[in-house]
């Protein structure tokens, strides 16, 4: 398996070689390389450029998409239970912190990508509903002389308990969306919520549509992370915010060793016992190790056009929240 650096080098050399050959053709020069050998070299470089990783395995870009889909199709029904078991429930705190950092205002239009089971969407709806109710109470206290009829009229004018806020959950996996919809019905979430089947690399939304874009524990599964970031930038309104909660690199050597031991020796076993799927959770562990560091991912977000990009490491760097703005 080629190292990441060597793949990048081959990709760079391939681009340089192609430019050189085009230059020779424009000048009317002929290559001294035998035709068959030259063609084989270029084809080999193109093949390498189209390869990516699926955990620790090297696969074609096209193959990765199908493999990732199968992983989440397989684990969808046990996804939330496994999140609780693997993280000992700490993932709930991380997601609460994401909402605290988001601090959505009334009327916020949120796009939650790779949010199939609805964890972020439900937290958002709870948050904005609570904020709106507090606003209503403040307004009523300021109008204590109103009659009961006038108070009832005020409430009728405020039928939208979310204050105009909306969330769209977008996921590429039908099974994950199915689980999310079932949870929404069971927990009574109906208003201000929409479910859309879509690809993070090619979002089915117009430009400048959303105030906030979130993606939690999803972007490392995308084949072209740079393309997903560019799509996030495209669909956000000017002034909109990008927020990503994702596994990252542990910054404490002792905790890192313990984390590796737990990840590789315990998590796949839990996956087999609870979800009946060792391989999917082996991929999960490996995909975390292949994801860029906090600083590297920060650079990628900036390259996509975002400004004021920052990140906060949580639980010694096991996860990080990255934030950026579209200006």
UniProtKB/Swiss-Prot annotation:
Subcellular location(s) per record: Mitochondrion inner membrane
Keywords recorded for this protein, A-Z: Membrane, Methyltransferase, Mitochondrion, Mitochondrion inner membrane, Primary mitochondrial disease, S-adenosyl-L-methionine, Transferase, Transit peptide, Ubiquinone biosynthesis
Pathway terms, separated by semicolons: Cofactor biosynthesis; ubiquinone biosynthesis
Signal peptide per UniProt: none
Pfam families associated with the record: Ubie_methyltran
One GO term (biological process): methylation
Chemical reaction(s) catalysed: 2-methoxy-6-(all-trans-decaprenyl)benzene-1,4-diol + S-adenosyl-L-methionine = 5-methoxy-2-methyl-3-(all-trans-decaprenyl)benzene-1,4-diol + S-adenosyl-L-homocysteine + H(+)
Entry EC no(s): 2.1.1.201
Residues in coiled coil: none
Record-linked PROSITE patterns: SAM_MT_UBIE (PS51608), UBIE_1 (PS01183), UBIE_2 (PS01184)
Self-association and partners: Component of a multi-subunit COQ enzyme complex, composed of at least COQ3, COQ4, COQ5, COQ6, COQ7 and COQ9. Interacts with PYURF; the interaction is direct, stabilizes COQ5 protein and associates PYURF with COQ enzyme complex.
Disease / disorder: Coenzyme Q10 deficiency, primary, 9: A form of coenzyme Q10 deficiency, an autosomal recessive disorder with variable manifestations consistent with 5 major phenotypes. The phenotypes include an encephalomyopathic form with seizures and ataxia; a multisystem infantile form with encephalopathy, cardiomyopathy and renal failure; a predominantly cerebellar form with ataxia and cerebellar atrophy; Leigh syndrome with growth retardation; and an isolated myopathic form. COQ10D9 patients show cerebellar ataxia with cerebellar atrophy.
Biological role: Methyltransferase required for the conversion of 2-decaprenyl-6-methoxy-1,4-benzoquinol (DDMQH2) to 2-decaprenyl-3-methyl-6-methoxy-1,4-benzoquinol (DMQH2).
Family: Belongs to the class I-like SAM-binding methyltransferase superfamily. MenG/UbiE family.
Protein name: 2-methoxy-6-polyprenyl-1,4-benzoquinol methylase, mitochondrial
Species annotation: Homo sapiens (Human)
Gene: COQ5
